[in-house]
Structures are given as C-alpha cells and as structure tokens.
Amino acid sequence: MIYTDFQGEKISQLGMGTMRLPVVDGDNANIDEAAALEMFDYAYKHGINYFDTAWGYHDGNAELVTGKALSRYPRESFHLTTKFPGYDRNHFPKVKEIFAKQLEKLQTEYFDFYLFHNVCEYNIENYLNPAFGVKEYLVSERAAGRIKHLGYS
C-alpha cells in the first residue's frame, strides 16, 4: 500500500467508501453484513486505513455496518470520515442530535475527518445560517477533540 503523510498521519492513498456496499435482494437498506465485513477485513488487512461513510448511505445503515466492522480494530489504526447530511434541509436544526447519533452508530469517540456533505448553491446558506448553528457547533466539536479535521464535500 502507498501512504501519504497528512499532518503527521500516515493515510493510505486508496480508501474504502461505503456508499455501495453489497445488499440483499436489491434492497439498498438491507446490507449483506457478512459480505460487507469481509470487504472491510480484506481492505484493512491489505493496508487500507482510510474509511469513508455518510449519514444517508444505504438509508442510514452504512454507518452502522462501518461501526461494527471497524470496532474490531484498534481505533488509532485507521482514519474515519463521515458527513453531515446537508442534502436534506430538515437536518440542519438537528445537527447536535445527528452528530451524537453518528458517534454512536460508528462506535467511536471521534472522527478523523468530518465533512459538510454535498455543499452547493442549494444548501450553502443553511450551512452558514447562524440560526441553525451547524458551522459553529461542528467547530466547537473540533475544539473538543471529537473532530480532528473539518471540511466539506
């Protein structure tokens, strides 16, 4: 595996995304957990240490399976990315609740990378709107150590 140094961290140049995990009977919400866990094991054992997921992948179940898979490895041995679901305007008032649920689903105390998801002209005002406090809250989580790197996708 080829690695890149990112601010003192060794990150694999190839990562594993969870937007399209194997499913049962074509049902996007019904992840074939055994097959997915095999994929995680294969990736990890072959040096992949960057894993990317998001709130909405597989109707919310990708974070659960990712958490289950990665909980079997030492937390400091991989880099975990997830995202705030800004593609749905109804999520903005729930930033604290969603963030807490993501920590729980992913069975972690912190995220290496946390991204404002799908930033575009449709939702940029909501991300920056002080009434929702999304930016402010996530910056405070970074200061508290629950987010190492904050960005956008």
Enumerate the language-model features and the residues they cover.
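N-terminal binding-site loop/beta-alpha segment at the start of enzyme catalytic domains
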Residues: 1-78, 137, 143
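Structural detector of well-ordered beta-strand residues that form the stable sheet scaffold
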Residues: 51, 80-81, 148-153
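Glycine/proline-rich, positively charged
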Residues: 90-153
